[in-house]
């Protein structure tokens, strides 16, 4: 279980009880400048700055007691935004047919960065069409994936 998984299991119940959706989290280690970023969402109405503040106070209290991260870090609570990161298969499924940007930990067919239409989502992977070529990318290799906003 990754640190992010542990943090999600720890925080999801509280965040959902507050009326928000736990969208995901990421821990960015950088010594004393490390960051724990928690993404929350709210159906249809979106997330306000006040919402982020309320959740931040609750999350901070839980993290202080449970202490899953031993070193110093900055806590950020944010909405996923228009270029929302994708963390879970059901999130990928919700954005099937849209343009995404994906970075993998290992090369897939010779590349690690992809920007194209996510044409298919299965239980184990996604298919992204880049310049007319289809790449099947296993979830296990995805380091980061974001929806590309359309204006």
UniProtKB/Swiss-Prot annotation:
One Pfam short name: DUF150_C
UniProt-listed InterPro entries: Ribosome_maturation_RimP, RimP_C, RimP_C_sf, RimP_N, RimP_N_sf
Top-level taxonomic group: Bacteria
GO biological process: ribosomal small subunit assembly; translation
UniProt subcellular location: Cytoplasm
Database matches in SUPFAM superfamilies: YhbC-like, C-terminal domain, YhbC-like, N-terminal domain
Keywords recorded for this protein, A-Z: Cytoplasm, Ribosome biogenesis
Transmembrane recorded as keyword: no
Record GO cellular component, one term: cytosol
UniProt-listed HAMAP family: RimP (MF_01077)
Protein family per UniProt: Belongs to the RimP family.
Known role: Required for maturation of 30S ribosomal subunits.
Listed name of the protein: Ribosome maturation factor RimP
Gene: rimP
